[in-house]
Amino acid sequence: MAAVAQSLQEQVAWACRILAAEGYADLTLGHVSARAADGSIWIKRKGVALAEVEADDVVSVEDTDAVLHLETVLHTGVYAVRADVGAVVHGHPPYATALGATTADLVPLTHDGILFADGVARFDDPDLIVNDDKGGAVAVALGERRALLMENHGVLVVGNDIPWAVLTAVTLERAARLQSIAHAFGELQPIDAQVAKELQPVKYRDEFVSEYWEAWQRQLDRAGGGLGGDRA
């Protein structure tokens, strides 16, 4: 299938639907945002489930008529300090959220885990992030990393664009799930840290991410969950 040019709002809508299919569905909770070339920030509106987001459900954070999520400051806080970030995901996937409720670290057990060879950040306040001060504190905790476990709450994931943010979010949950499964079998045997860092740029390339992004959309279309369908 040839790639089709998509608006930023369409990309955010696709991201929401893909994440819903990949373990991030949680009623109307969870949100994805993206930063446009002009610096404007667009985010899934409040009140709609990830699996049913359409392009017109993606609104500007500056729109005074839009109903925004309470935790929109999670997104604006990161964009304020990370010029490299073009997209942000917040959600409550079960395995990564459960990992964040323990003292265990995510380790590079598989090729999924090597995406986080530089570590996953942590934020130790379980409260909702509803003001600029807390949004800024989360951004500080994230630092230069690509993912953060919000202890007893959920996850925050960033990418330089929407496909990368989605891949990172999906891979974080998969890595946490595989670690949980492996732990049930016995002692964990992670990939050597240096090997993981060397393998990461081989395994995770822009061209691969583009392939995965298009594949996710084809899968959703075949399942009837693509854009333009009926509300879930």
List the model feature ranges, each with a label:
Residues 1-232:
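Glycine-rich flexible loops
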